[in-house]
Amino acid sequence: MDQAKQDELKKAAAKKAAALVEDGMVLGVGTGSTVKFFIDELGKKKAAGLTLKAVVTTSSRSQKQLEGYGFTVSPLSEVDQVDLTVDGADRVDKQLNGIKGGGAALTLEKNVAVNSKKNVWIVDESKVVDHLSGFALPVEVLPISCMQVEKRLADEGLKPEFRLTEDGQRLKTHYGNYILDLKLDRIPVPSGLADYLDHTVGVVEHGLFLNICDQVIIARDNGEIEVRSR
């Protein structure tokens, strides 16, 4: 499929997600190529009179785009709860569980998501899988114990690798931590791995988003827009 056709599908999915946004909401906005089109749709709705109580976002790129449309972006700490968050995902399975954090913003993404009444992901068909696989699982770790965590994960057969910058340095997250990418072919029991990582000292957060997403809007290659709900 050529890029122009793929973009048209993403725009259609973004428009469907934008239809869920209502006046007076506290809205969470993620990042990614499809979310970019969602923000464009928000801009149209704002021009038509949409008013939001607050907007929070998970990336500086989305913040800049939102502000370009006249939205004021607030930090998560300044809102009690988010009514709706629209974001992308790196992978999503049949149970609407997903892998996120390819952009290294997993800690903020998960904090926004778990503090949202409803989470909607918009993705293209390439992100949809039967079982979580085909994408490295990011794990954010504290620098002070990163080597110990790496060894512990390696001993468990989880194949950790430090994510590096273009010049070969360890990539630092917004919070000054490192990312270990788990190069797993497949995650057979996501809940078990999530529980293990949750209880590993030195792990700040991981990219398994389980029982968080309420609805996925999928741009299919055949031109259809599919909606799956939990």
From Swiss-Prot:
Binding residues annotated for substrate, in chain numbering: 31-34, 87-90, 100-103, 127
Pathway(s) of this molecule: Carbohydrate degradation; pentose phosphate pathway; D-ribose 5-phosphate from D-ribulose 5-phosphate (non-oxidative stage): step 1/1
InterPro entries associated with the record: NagB/RpiA_transferase-like, Ribose5P_isomerase_typA_subgr, Ribose5P_isomerase_type_A
Coiled coil: none
Keywords: Isomerase
Residue numbers annotated as active site: 109 (proton acceptor)
EC number(s) recorded for this UniProt protein: 5.3.1.6
Top-level taxon: Bacteria
GO terms under biological process: D-ribose metabolic process; pentose-phosphate shunt, non-oxidative branch
Complex and partners: Homodimer.
Name by which UniProt lists this protein: Ribose-5-phosphate isomerase A
Protein species of origin: Lactobacillus delbrueckii subsp. bulgaricus (strain ATCC 11842 / DSM 20081 / BCRC 10696 / JCM 1002 / NBRC 13953 / NCIMB 11778 / NCTC 12712 / WDCM 00102 / Lb 14)
Protein's gene: rpiA
